């Protein structure tokens, strides 16, 4: 591993200002020298300001992902992870959401490609994305409960491409029960 981790010092300092606590900022480089910087934001109110810092640095949004902090043990405790690339360096920030009312502000006005990511969060996990310019569903019928896939389909089924028939049978079965 290299001794000096590359990255834009101004971006690192600006994102670090939205973090608090030990381990909230983490820097690493892999065996090939690819640098990445991780930031745990103190709250959802820091998502748009952090995205603005990255927009100003000409970052490219790579992906927004969600995971369950509880590991499925105590109910759904969502956390979002935003991944950006500023030529050659990855900047990621995470933010924990309220388990009872998961909501996050939209960054689609800053990064147009956040549109689908944020709509998936709403559709599949029932995470409210405040201020999204087009909150329509992408894939699932509007009659299905929002976030249905969070509880209806085991992760092993959802992740196994060979079982996509099982996935859709579960979704359609839930819809038939509602009718």
Report the location of each language-model feature.
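Terminal low-complexity/charged segments
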Residues: 1-179
């Amino acid at each position: 591993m290299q001794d000096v981790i590359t990255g834009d010092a101004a971006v690192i300092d600006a994102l670090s200002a939205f973090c608090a606590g030990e381990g909230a900022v983490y820097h690493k480089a892999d065996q090939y020298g690819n640098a990445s910087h991780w930031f745990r934001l103190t709250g959802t109110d820091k998502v748009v300001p952090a995205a603005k810092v990255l927009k100003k640095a000409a970052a490219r949004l790579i992906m927004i992902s969600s995971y369950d902090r509880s590991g499925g043990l105590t109910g759904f405790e969502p956390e979002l992870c935003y991944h950006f690339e500023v030529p050659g360096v990855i900047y990621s920030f995470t933010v924990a959401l309220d388990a009872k009312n998961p909501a996050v502000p939209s960054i689609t006005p800053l990064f147009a490609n956040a549109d689908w990511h944020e709509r998936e969060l709403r559709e599949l996990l029932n995470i409210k994305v405040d201020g999204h310019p087009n909150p329509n569903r992408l894939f699932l019928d509007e009659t299905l409960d929002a976030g249905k896939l969070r509880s209806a389909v085991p992760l092993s089924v959802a992740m196994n491409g060979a079982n996509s028939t099982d996935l859709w049978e579960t979704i359609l079965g839930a819809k038939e029960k509602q009718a």
